[in-house]
Regions:
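Noncatalytic, solvent-exposed loop/strand surfaces
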Residues: 1-210
């Protein structure tokens, strides 16, 4: 955060000199976390994908900071911001940039085409969360995982279709810790404020997963 702008900057590792800077107007702040973006920019195939706390998603040329395309994920989902802002880092997979704004109308999870920012697919009606979407292979199935304010969910990353879900209710719906894959079938989830943790076993049963 630099005054009223969210900023992405690149520095030389040896000298510390700034190579380039790119920013946009936006100031998110609240008393506990302070001002500024929360999510770590994601690098993939020569491009950088920063997500601002107010939902501004951009694709940049990583070598010079040139803007390639932009979207606002909250506007695309038709949903308001979370109390502590957009925090989950974008996930890049198979030519798509996947984010989790939360919301209704089957737009909780949005996959954008990395080439031009057009929407590839949307999925789910869910409350937003603070953890980043992630990939895992569980029960011999490659999956897209996201941790909402109410549940942990596994989707097919190709089209966003639901594979399985497990309810997870915590104080104030604050789920911010990344789920951890323990082995080929088990996933560990946890939440703060005294809620605790669970070890889940994902099983392929019939045509689906539990």
């Amino acid at each position: 955060q630099r005054r009223d702008r969210e900023v992405v900057a690149a520095y030389d590792l040896r000298s510390g000199l700034q190579h380039w800077e790119h920013g946009w107007t936006g100031l998110f702040q609240e008393s506990m976390g302070g001002p500024g973006p929360r999510a770590t920019p994601t690098w993939s195939d020569g491009k950088l994908y920063p997500l601002g706390a107010l939902g501004e998603l951009q694709a940049l040329n990583a070598s010079n900071g040139e803007l390639l395309w932009r979207r606002n994920i909250l506007e695309d989902a038709g949903v308001g911001n979370l109390t502590w802002g957009m925090s989950g880092a974008p996930l890049v997979d198979d030519g798509r940039v996947i984010v989790f704004p939360g919301g209704r109308n089957n737009k909780s999870v949005i996959a954008y085409n990395a080439a031009d920012g057009s929407i590839a697919w949307t999925s789910q009606d869910d409350q937003g969360g603070y953890a980043s979407p992630q990939l895992a292979t569980l029960a011999d199935k490659r999956q897209l995982l996201y941790f909402s304010g109410k549940r942990i969910v596994g989707l097919d990353p190709a089209d966003g279709s639901l594979l399985w879900e497990h309810p997870w209710y915590s104080n104030n719906d604050i789920n911010s810790a990344q789920p951890i894959q323990v082995d080929d079938d088990h996933l560990w989830v946890s939440s703060s404020y005294g809620h605790g943790s669970e070890l889940l076993k994902i099983v392929h049963r019939g045509d689906g997963f539990v």
